[in-house]
Amino acid sequence: MESQQLHQNPHSQHGSAYASVTSKEVPSNQDPLAVSASNLPEFDRDSTKVNSQEETTPGTSAVPENHHHVSPQPASVPPPQNGQYQQHGMMTPNKAMASNWAHYQQPSMMTCSHYQTSPAYYQPDPHYPLPQYIPPLSTSSPDPIDSQDQHSEVPQAKTKVRNNVLPPHTLTSEENFSTWVKFYIRFLKNSNLGDIIPNDQGEIKRQMTYEEHAYIYNTFQAFAPFHLLPTWVKQILEINYSDILTVLCKSVSKMQTNNQELKDWIALANLEYNGSTSADTFEITVSTIIQRLKENNINVSDRLACQLILKGLSGDFKYLRNQYRTKTNMKLSQLFAEIQLIYDENKIMNLNKPSQYKQHSEYKNVSRTSPNTTNTKVTTRNYHRTNSSKPRAAKAHNIATSSKFSRVNSDHINESTVSSQYLSDDNELSLGQQQKESKPTRTIDSNDELPDHLLIDSGASQTLVRSAHYLHHATPNSEINIVDAQKQDIPINAIGNLHFNFQNGTKTSIKALHTPNIAYDLLSLSELANQNITACFTRNTLERSDGTVLAPIVKHGDFYWLSKKYLIPSHISKLTINNVNKSKSVNKYPYPLIHRMLGHANFRSIQKSLKKNAVTYLKESDIEWSNASTYQCPDCLIGKSTKHRHVKGSRLKYQESYEPFQYLHTDIFGPVHHLPKSAPSYFISFTDEKTRFQWVYPLHDRREESILNVFTSILAFIKNQFNARVLVIQMDRGSEYTNKTLHKFFTNRGITACYTTTADSRAHGVAERLNRTLLNDCRTLLHCSGLPNHLWFSAVEFSTIIRNSLVSPKNDKSARQHAGLAGLDITTILPFGQPVIVNNHNPDSKIHPRGIPGYALHPSRNSYGYIIYLPSLKKTVDTTNYVILQNNQTKLDQFDYDTLTFDDDLNRLTAHNQSFIEQNETEQSYDQNTESDHDYQSEIEINSDPLVNDFSSQSLNPLQLDKEPVQKVRAPKEVDADISEYNILPSTIRSRTPHIINKESTEMGGTIESDTTSPRHSSTFTARNQKRPGSPNDMIDLTSQDRVNYGLENIKTTRLGGTEEPYIQRNSDTNIKYRTTNSTPSIDDRSSNSESTTPIISIETKAVCDNTPSIDTDPPEYRSSDHATPNIMPDKSSKNVTADSILDDLPLPDLTHKSPTDTSDVAKDIPHIHSRQTNSSLGGMDDSNVLTTTKSKKRSLEDNETEIEVSRDTWNNKNMRSLEPPRSKKRINLIAAIKGVKSIKPVRTTLRYDEAITYNKDNKEKDRYVEAYHKEISQLLKMNTWDTNKYYDRNDIDPKKVINSMFIFNKKRDGTHKARFVARGDIQHPDTYDSDMQSNTVHHYALMTSLSIALDNDYYITQLDISSAYLYADIKEELYIRPPPHLGLNDKLLRLRKSLYGLKQSGANWYETIKSYLINCCDMQEVRGWSCVFKNSQVTICLFVDDMILFSKDLNANKKIITTLKKQYDTKIINLGEGDNEIQYDILGLEIKYQRSKYMKLGMEKSLTEKLPKLNVPLNPKGKKLRAPGQPGHYIDQDELEIDEDEYKEKVHEMQKLIGLASYVGYKFRFDLLYYINTLAQHILFPSRQVLDMTYELIQFMWDTRDKQLIWHKNKPTKPDNKLVAISDASYGNQPYYKSQIGNIFLLNGKVIGGKSTKASLTCTSTTEAEIHAVSEAIPLLNNLSHLVQELNKKPIIKGLLTDSRSTISIIKSTNEEKFRNRFFGTKAMRLRDEVSGNNLYVYYIETKKNIADVMTKPLPIKTFKLLTNKWIH
């Protein structure tokens, strides 16, 4: 038979999209090659019919009805156009060319003996068309001898062989190839070649013989002309013209894909489910089919899927069909949930079902209903659920009723009672008989009703009938309201009785309701039970309580029915019943409709509005109000949901039975921020319910152990002290109370833990109110006493003692009296914060005072003493040795006895201490290391004595002022020794001792000259709190007409680097001093080194004690000439090195010397005072950072530091706001923000998977990212990144070893889109990597040095890139990652083999791998001290991860290295660097233009042009360009920044983004911007409007100068040596905390290769100390660079250091070791001497105006900035 000959695929899948989903006749398993007859041509259908018949007739009469076989005509079967075959199965060349088949001149490949053919087989040609039958290839035909042995195992016999085979029709078009190939395969199968045809998996059962190959080849040519074949077939045959099997294999695969849709539709249309398999399995099967169709672009809606599923449900699941019948919005997930629910319930019932059924007698008593109950006691289920093992009564859905006649408030009916339809079968069953049903069903529709029967409902409490024919004594319904399970009203027309006449004459009557709107007549078992009638479902009878059988009941379907023949009919007409209430209910609107129309208003509001005629065209009588008052709107219940109301006093009735100390309330408060570690951050309170006695315990944390210790203590205390046992503890649901440890503690002690409900804090009111009361007391006590905030718990404890002793308004006794304790002894209590003097029983010396000032806190718990706080010792003591200080002063400040020595003015300043911070605002500090809050801020009135002019007669005329204007200055928020200009204690300012300036003391910098960089009077001062003219605090305009010095103490300026600043003396004799020349340098020198010609008014900053020795560091020989350049000559070779040789070729500005300015008129040099309102320049901190005072002669520097330590504990009432709940506003303090800056947070420039692909709306970009994604996956698989042989279960692997992974996407600078699969190394566990391993990359200085040497030596520069570099490094640790998202393996893990990007160890692994390869295979050596710099005799390599830069004199040497690298790594040549013309590179972000032997230019114009506009900075491309990034004269305001939380985060993020980009550019090549970048980076966490404006100004300047480049020119070939020079500078005290800014610029052979601008790590007390610090920072890097240069280039090297500080040079040169101020700077100087002499370092002086390092340390005027930078960057 044909079915036996055809090859059947046992793995065939489901169908095609063309199948009808409603067809049930389609077989589930079809031949994948079969096609529908409707899709075939007419002659194909006929041939299909022929082939489908059984082989029971001879071949000569196989299909006599086919007219083609009777008289074949060429018209009906188109003859092949290929011509006749050759005798040996080959076409002749002419025939081949004629039929468009290529002749391959390889006849030997296909020659074979002519196989056996039947006489009926004719060679096809135009004159002899193909016959309708072709004899099959016989398996018994002789094979060649050599093939017989080869195929000896091939079966040689078939069970049945067909005599004739119907040939396929000839291919007529390319589109019909898929249909044609099906018939051709069928033809081959009928020719006994089915076992050599590949199936859909590409498998074959045996190899074909040579003869069979020729047969397939020839027949394929005969019926498939070459020019009609599809393109993909031609491509296969062009490669191998005889590879027909490949064509057939791919054709089968394509047909399988097409047929899969049909099979899926067939499977979906024929779904069946009866619960025999799990619901989960059924859901997975259906979901898989739907998902597969969706992947083929066929979307199956939820409604269609639900309909197909419901159609196949049976058994207990069939009822769902009726439930979903009327639904329009079907959800597939909801249907699956319903199926799962039924399946689970049936599973439980089957587990609980007894193994044996009871006998009939055993069920009798169980199933009978008690006559005294309202509801039946029969154990039955709702008809929604069934157990087919035994019959059950139906139970309808709840029907809520409200009636004075009803005994039960709910009735039960079917929710789908819509219409009444009857079965055709009207036969009543006999007693005890049950209708047989072929299949259990749960669907309740009209076909299930048993006509003329009542449905017995065990759940309904009322009987309902549709016909009034049986209703007796009917009365209109006026009060009964019935609703179904969906809360829909069921109208009741009438109320009456049903009269029954049972067997043996028993009559009874029950109440019934009439309604036509139900599907069945319902008989309530509850109503029957009231008449002592029960239903026995084991015998199917209605019985009396005594067992008398009244009537049989019938089981039909799943329900039990009682025949209506037992009902006595009435004579009331149906029309009468239906019209009983018609007059009352006609034309009335339902209340739910009006409720919705009027916006879900409440019942009373609607009714009252209608009564008052507030709504027109609607009357109160028009609405059906019958159930309006009880109507529950589901939308209102959801939308208007509220918490339950707490009735006042309701708690007491539940707790009256408890005795004292049996019921406790507890709660935890905290944390309190910004406290020292020794102070508690939390407290836990307890309150007894009966006595209201209170306890508080301090806590440092909320750990389980800490809480458990407190509970142990309180329980033991109550048990021992009050002889009581705690029974109940009420608390909230915080994790500190709900943990297992505490729960076990309560369980073991028999204590009931009473928790509040979710989000119900009012239920915990006792504890919450106590915490509020204690905190109110705490704030009040601390504010009154002025004590520091770390004593807050002492205030809480004091409040607890007092509250326990006072009578509350609700009680007639105090808590102590309720507890049986004595009242509080008032003589043992001191006011909180009462000043006392404590006896020091152990003084350090016999002559030291024995009294220590302190403050009383509270009575001691552990002794009869008192807890007293001692500020000087910063601790509390428990003592009775104290004396109360009787005065009216309560502030802590009054006990600093040094303040008593101050004058009256300073004492007046301490008279008041006002806070300018609102009480309710929240303080948040960013200093995580602050021990305590000292955010003191006060208004300080500076009112000095009138100034007396002390100018000579040649200068200004004196002018006496009656009174100095008063100016209020707000002190900085953070009081600290390093930042406070007044050394402020609360409300206290230390007295100032005038510092006398030596008239001869000037800066070492040459003669006095006028400022050549700016016009006279152009410099600006800026005073904070500057008033408009006319105000008392006006700034005085010091013009030439008004040249007096008065009120200068109100002028506040800051030191800008080395520029001399205004100096104000605090005595009456105030002089303005100017620079002179030829003075002795001193370590305490207050002078600076830049802009020496500008007359400056200087305010002294952190003066050193008068007894500090100064160093005469400048020998007489250096005082005689302003241009002397002292140098240090370490060895004899220094004779050939001069200052000119060091300064030669350096990019220093050319200065034109001018004659000294006439200084006879002092006022000419006093600049105007301007008030600039534009974007301010960078000038460091504001005036408060400069206005500092000298210390008293009575104290040394060490004493002052001790005093400041004490003041840090000083209380500021503003800090107690940290005890309050946080608010939406936050205040940012400048000092705290600067402390909080650790580093610039990198801004994310990459995209996640969802951003790049899933939700990317740019389709073009999305496609590029998808392409990059697949490229990355291919590369990962190629590199064997993970083990693909095994997937690991997530639960079996240690979580520490599991690394999260993700895809990141970005767009490279060249426009290509990149995808990278990376590991989340930021959350990698420390145990999974070796922290000692280092991931190294080339230092930027090393790259710049290599580029500079390449320019001077005409090197070729080659740029390479290694693809997926990290993946070449193996990983040693056992790590696992989650698979990529496209695999869909969320619960599986892959084991890593390679160092994936992002892992902590990947960089180190790759570094070790490439380092080993370069050393061992490329003969390279790594330069010591400079990682990732490798060299040999010819080539230098700089390595940055996967980027390599090669430098060589010979390009072939570079090529040799490239060849070696390509043997191991996928190496791409980015730029070979050949040629003598200008070559452009993009090396690590630098855009480099290089022309050998001439120049090199480094810039970032393209990158900045692309990136800067994306920063959302208001650039002004067409406006006036900025000429400098900032100018001196304006300062960053210290006023607190009050800002919303969200806005603050947004601005900080913006600052990070802007400064991050600026920093990247600055450290690459824009060294002239480093000062501004470094200063702004310190203010990232203080994003005030002013800081943002400064940042925008910097970005604007970068935009205006984006085309600037760092220019290098080749060194002169006449110079044989390399010259490495560092230029150093420092700006004294111009940074926060009076730190100095230091800067260094490094040059190699006159080319700037690097720069550094940073804040000094230590505070310097003079400009000389700052300069020493700057030089000490430059020398180590200078030595390291020297070593690198010598390794890369063997020329001799000269190292030079230039500074504009003569005193620093003198200190380095001097041998005097006795005059250093302290040990630190002494050792600094000594080390400098050693390094200079030991490293052949030449130190020379450079003029300040030529010092290009000035741009690293201070803001400069425009002309000065351009003058210092235009030689090396332009």
Swiss-Prot record:
Residues 1625-1767 form the RNase H Ty1/copia-type domain. GO terms for molecular function: aspartic-type endopeptidase activity; ATP binding; DNA binding; DNA-directed DNA polymerase activity; RNA binding; RNA-directed DNA polymerase activity; RNA-DNA hybrid ribonuclease activity; zinc ion binding. A motif (Bipartite nuclear localization signal) lies at residues 1193-1227. The record marks H397, N398, N578, N579, A1232, A1233 as: Cleavage. Residues 369-381 have a biased composition (Low complexity). Residues 579-636 are annotated as: Integrase-type zinc finger-like. The active site is at D457 (for protease activity). The keyword DNA repair does not apply. The C-terminal RNA-binding region of CA is sufficient for all its nucleocapsid-like chaperone activities. Retrotransposons are mobile genetic entities that are able to replicate via an RNA intermediate and a reverse transcription step. In contrast to retroviruses, retrotransposons are non-infectious, lack an envelope and remain intracellular. Ty2 retrotransposons belong to the copia elements (pseudoviridae). This is Transposon Ty2-DR2 Gag-Pol polyprotein. It comes from Saccharomyces cerevisiae (strain ATCC 204508 / S288c). The gene is TY2B-DR2.
